[in-house]
Every structure is written in structure tokens, then in C-alpha cells.
Amino acid sequence: MKVSADTPGHDDPGPGRRLGLDVGTVRIGVAASDRDAKLAMPVETVPRETGFKGPDLADIDRLVAIVEEYNAVEVIVGLPTDLQGNGSASVKHAKEIAFRVRRRLTNAGKNIPVRLGDERLTTVVATQALRASGVSEKAGRKVIDQAAAVEILQTWLDARTRALEPQSTDTQDFDEKGNFPG
């Protein structure tokens, strides 16, 4: 099934920190941006507890607390898709966590957007980077979740920056006759 992520820069909340979440069935990797929304950094790995039914558990409590601790203006939840844009089985998990975090923030009177960001290949990239630095996949699973969250968030931040840049008309490179000077 085709799934689509949200568009970075669309309905942008402006300057401020963003959080990125890599939702798995066992753990949720968390990353945060700097205040300028240029650089993503790992924060922590939250054990996954909340399922599809029942109340929010400690994982949702912790994620909402991190949003508040970092004064985040936007939360990006990785949407797991393949290279063709088809959703994997993990899409339901990502959407469930996004829904629960959004609901809790809204119920607390906080108008913080929770968006779904493209997650293609983020865990692969994170695993390769950690392996290259000498960390085994088994030893670094918690770190891999954080690194994947960093990849999700950094991809969003880069796309946001491009989307918000003023579009150049390139006319400044030409003289008044339309010729390139020099």
C-alpha cells in the first residue's frame, strides 16, 4: 500500500527545536535539533510499551516529557516505507505512536504539530555508520535507534531548509541587456 509522508516546510511552525522519532516494536529512538533547526543530535532510546489497544503507557509519557523538556515546536515520526513508497508492516506502529503523542499534546493545550517524515533507509544508514565506527549491531541496538532518529530528523531539517529558502531567479547574474557579464 502506498503511504505518503508530510512535506517539510508546509505549515511550518517557525524557528525552534524539532524532535525526530524512530518507532520500532521494542524501542523508540529519539533525536532533537538545535534551536536553529539545522542539526539533529541523538537524545535517548525509550523502551516501547504502548500497543494498539489500551491506555498510553510510560513510553508515551516519556515522549511527551521530552517534547516539553526540549520546548519542541514540531515532532517528526519516521514513516517506514520501501524505495517505491509502499508502507511496511511498521507503518501502523509509527502512526499509532504519532496519534497518541499528538492526542496527549493537544489534550494538554499544546498546539505542536506531529508529522510523519520519510524514513527510507534510515536504519540501514545508521547501522552502516555505527558499524564503520566499530559498534556492532547487537551491541549498539539502542544507539542504532537513536542514530536512525537522527537520520529521520536530519533529512526533515535539510528538506525544510530547502523548502523555506527564497527561490532564486538568477537574474542578478545578467546585465541589463540579459547578457552574462564578463
UniProtKB/Swiss-Prot annotation:
The keyword Nuclease applies. GO terms for cellular component: cytosol. One of its GO terms (molecular function) is nuclease activity. SUPFAM superfamilies: Ribonuclease H-like. It comes from the Bacteria. Its EC number is 3.1.-.-. One of its GO terms (biological process) is rRNA 5'-end processing. SMART domains: YqgFc (SM00732). Gene3D superfamilies: YqgF/RNase H-like domain (3.30.420.140). It is an enzyme of class 3 (hydrolase). InterPro entries: RNaseH-like_sf (IPR012337), YqgF (IPR005227), YqgF/RNaseH-like_dom (IPR006641), YqgF/RNaseH-like_dom_sf (IPR037027). It is found in: Cytoplasm. Keywords: Cytoplasm, Hydrolase, Nuclease, Ribosome biogenesis. Belongs to the YqgF nuclease family. Could be a nuclease involved in processing of the 5'-end of pre-16S rRNA. This is Putative pre-16S rRNA nuclease. It comes from Corynebacterium glutamicum (strain ATCC 13032 / DSM 20300 / JCM 1318 / BCRC 11384 / CCUG 27702 / LMG 3730 / NBRC 12168 / NCIMB 10025 / NRRL B-2784 / 534).
